[in-house]
């Protein structure tokens, strides 16, 4: 592990390690229910579902019944595999207020140092939540035009690069899809780590008030 304080965290009075072999069986209004029947109230729920990053294994439902699968083009016909990711910076998803992704689709170049990216995204999320608390804001989500703009930028980031010349995991649409005129979809940000941070932290594509919708 890269964090020296990881193990000592479990000794804090506000931390409890729950070891249930059968895991979580239900998400309740206030927290989670374990297979053992125990319930735990939580303020924040972090989904950690493994390394099959294309697969959406359970429904994540947002405003008006819209799901993460809907936003990412996953359905039963394609075995819930993500095909058309749409997001802002790979972190915010439209119609899913207060939902944050880390190293999600459309966020990183595949040769990026993931640890550093996680640190910067974590700082961004923490600072945004702190701002919301200070201003009395209860919900935040990206604007539709911001999502469309970032998706277009991700698509353009692969232009002139080898990724477009073959079928590969990083392109959610294949070379044959593009040649047939079907919707092009880019699963990764193919520019540099520095240019990504210029958007997230430096307002290169617009500031938070321009790109995000805040609700009291």
Regions from the PLM with identified roles:
Residues 18-20, 54, 70, 132-142:
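Acidic/polar loop patches that form or flank catalytic/metal-binding clefts of enzymes
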Residues 86-87, 98-216:
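C-terminal, flexible cofactor-proximal segment of oxidoreductases
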Residues 11, 39-40, 92-95:
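Extracellular/periplasmic catalytic domains that process cell-envelope and extracellular macromolecules
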Residues 39-41, 67, 171:
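Short, solvent-exposed loop/turn motifs
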Residues 9, 13-35:
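A conserved short coil-to-beta-strand element within the FAD-binding core of flavoproteins
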Residues 33-44:
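Core beta-strand elements of the Rossmann-like FAD/NAD(P) dinucleotide-binding domain
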